[in-house]
Amino acid sequence: MNQYHNCINYLLSKKTNLIPHGDKTFFDHMVGVYNFLRKINQPNDVCFAGLFHSIYGNEFFDAELNPSREEIKNIIGPEAESLVFKFNNTSREELWNSDNVKIKNILLANKLDI
């Protein structure tokens, strides 16, 4: 099974498809962010970070899934997990003001709420 399918299976095992997120589910939102990042030809680490961008919970949304960092690293890889951790543990204002283009692309995809 490929990495994308492993990620999808993990997200479904956490019942993210049953968690409301605006007018859709948390699962649909995360897949939408991933798909947007793929469409704009982002590298794999950014796309998989987008797929898991709010898995730890942040100042705007927390599904209280509480996965360990090691668990997420094993699923999406250490580079993607590092982006996810930063996304969830840094204020949005600070992220938007950073020079990190990878994070900014995830922020953009999230903001568009694809």
Regions found by a protein language model. Give the residues of each.
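Metal-dependent phosphohydrolase cores
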Residues: 1-114
